[in-house]
């Protein structure tokens, strides 16, 4: 059995207009994230992990922030595109682990909804998707509530 592991990482700064979209879910918060697309830092990290596992570069290569076509783009559409590339190469996702690093907003009330959206978009069982959150104990830019960072690790298996 052939397997591939991908790691994704993304950061966005607070300061944009609401809504704040994380993992395809609108999370109530006073500001959004500054981004060329919809700023969904969770789905961006997952997309990067999938592309990395497939040795296809990163989301900046596929959806450059200099291209007006992707201005305000729905990150769910971008994620589905990245996953379709993997499917076209004969791979599907076995499991996904995501860590949201943010002092605010509190993520716990939104985790299950985020897992459901990701599972639907990746045509996967929700039990194969883990999303968790942590803080940096008020240290660094996330601790000062200046932005959100996300790491994602994906295991892809040859179909």
Curated annotation (Swiss-Prot):
A Pfam family that the UniProt record links to this protein: YgbB
A Gene Ontology biological process annotation?
A: terpenoid biosynthetic process
Q: In which pathway does it act?
A: Isoprenoid biosynthesis; isopentenyl diphosphate biosynthesis via DXP pathway; isopentenyl diphosphate from 1-deoxy-D-xylulose 5-phosphate: step 4/6
The UniProt note on the cofactor reads as follows:
Binds 1 divalent metal cation per subunit.
State the Gene3D superfamilies in the record.
2-C-methyl-D-erythritol 2,4-cyclodiphosphate synthase
Q: Which domain of life is it from?
A: Bacteria
Tell me which cofactor or cofactors this protein depends on: a divalent metal cation
According to UniProt, residues marked as the site described as Transition state stabilizer are 36, 135
Keywords of this entry: Isoprene biosynthesis, Lyase, Metal-binding
UniProt-recorded Gene Ontology molecular function terms: 2-C-methyl-D-erythritol 2,4-cyclodiphosphate synthase activity; metal ion binding
Q: Where along the chain is a divalent metal cation bound?
A: 10, 12, 44
List the EC numbers from the record. 4.6.1.12
> What is this enzyme's catalytic activity, as reactions?
4-CDP-2-C-methyl-D-erythritol 2-phosphate = 2-C-methyl-D-erythritol 2,4-cyclic diphosphate + CMP
- So what family is this one in? Belongs to the IspF family.
Quaternary structure, from the entry: Homotrimer.
The job of this chain, per UniProt, is described as: Involved in the biosynthesis of isopentenyl diphosphate (IPP) and dimethylallyl diphosphate (DMAPP), two major building blocks of isoprenoid compounds. Catalyzes the conversion of 4-diphosphocytidyl-2-C-methyl-D-erythritol 2-phosphate (CDP-ME2P) to 2-C-methyl-D-erythritol 2,4-cyclodiphosphate (ME-CPP) with a corresponding release of cytidine 5-monophosphate (CMP).
Supply the name of the protein. Answer: 2-C-methyl-D-erythritol 2,4-cyclodiphosphate synthase
Tell me the lineage of the source organism: Bacteria, Pseudomonadati, Pseudomonadota, Gammaproteobacteria, Alteromonadales
């Amino acid at each position: 059995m052939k397997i591939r592991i991908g790691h994704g990482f993304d950061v966005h700064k607070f300061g944009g207009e609401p809504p704040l979209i994380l993992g395809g879910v609108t999370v109530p918060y006073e500001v959004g994230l500054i981004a060329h697309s919809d700023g969904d830092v969770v789905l961006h990290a997952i997309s990067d992990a999938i592309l990395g596992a497939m040795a296809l570069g990163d989301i900046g290569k596929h959806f450059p922030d200099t291209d007006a076509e992707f201005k305000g783009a729905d990150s769910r559409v971008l994620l589905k595109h990245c996953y379709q590339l993997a499917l076209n190469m004969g791979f599907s996702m076995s499991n996904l682990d995501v860590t949201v690093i943010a002092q605010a907003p509190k993520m716990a009330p939104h985790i299950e909804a985020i897992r459901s959206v990701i599972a639907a978009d990746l045509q996967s069982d929700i039990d194969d998707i883990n999303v968790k959150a942590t803080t940096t104990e008020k240290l660094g830019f996330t601790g000062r509530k200046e932005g959100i960072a996300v790491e994602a690790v994906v295991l892809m298996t040859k179909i």
